[in-house]
Amino acid sequence: MNLIALVLLAASAVLFAGGAGAQQSPSPPPPPLIDWDKIQIKTTDLGNNTYMLEGQGGNITVAVGTDGIIMVDGQFAPLSAKIKAAIAAISPLPIKYLINTHFHGDHTGGNENFAKDGAVVVAQDNIRVRLAAGTINGITGAKTEPRPAGALPKETYIGGTKTVQVGGRTAQLTHGTNAHTDGDTWVYFADANVLCTGDTSNNTKRYQTIDFANGGDIRGMIAANEAYLRAANDSTKVVVGHGPLAKRSDVAEFHAMLVTARERIEKLVNEGKSEAEVVAARPLADLDAKWAANEGAATAFTRMVYNSFKRS
């Protein structure tokens, strides 16, 4: 998949990561570059009746209880039938809750399809607000149309945490304030030691989008990953937004990159440098060599970090 084209078309949520792990725009319908018939759903057993599903879009987590299923994220609408089939191969029990980690369409595109089957869509309230109103991407200017009522979360929370329980399984939801977006939720299944980060962290070894136009902020991204490092141990299975199953050490590497990027760009912001001046200075050149697939990715990430400090 050509990630440059995806970004220009649809304001990708993981910058130029390449391959099947790359994210699409915050809004369905997705661009017509994807041959949905060729996408396969890969299932990984995480232990204790908990599973990770990979397809096209954000990683999915499935936790099976005695009388139903908790699902975290739902990828794109055209993949719902394949995702349902993959879950049915795990368990015949109904999906009772679908938790959204944030509003971007590669994580929420399946909301309406799963809700029609009886799943209650749960999210931090800012996700509902963003989906209902539509959004604009700060880098590309791409507009996202409002989602239909059937795609909106039916159960939301505003405080810092929420608990979802099904048949002996407990999902602990925590709002990561102003991180990837303003509505990020990370989810922890303590009985399986599985942590789901959404797009506040990734394991693609590429830069991550900071959706500053919709409340994203590198400082919140750093805070979220610090929370993961506190919560995780060496045995924790980390289902990141994109990329293969991660370990605590992967989160630590991603966190270190974010901290370095923040320190360097914040210094230039404090010196009064403009966005163009910061981009021209290439303060992340050494990081770009590892974390950016190309110059466009490097520029976009620098702009996103800069604009974190310019949010109103």
PLM regions with names:
Residues M1-L8:
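Bacterial N-terminal signal peptides that target proteins for export
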Residues L8, G18-P32, R230-K237, P244-S312:
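Accessory terminal helices/loops
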Residues Q24-L46:
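Short N-terminal segments immediately surrounding and downstream of signal-peptide cleavage
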Residues K42-I87, T185-F189, N193-D199:
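Conserved beta-strand hairpin/beta-sheet module of binuclear metal-dependent hydrolase folds
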Residues T43, T66-I70, P78-V122:
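Active-site metal-binding motif and surrounding structural segment of the metallo-beta-lactamase
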Residues D45, G68-I69, F76-P78, I127-T260, ...:
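Metallo-beta-lactamase
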Residues N49, A63, D73, I87, ...:
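Divalent metal-coordination and catalytic microenvironments
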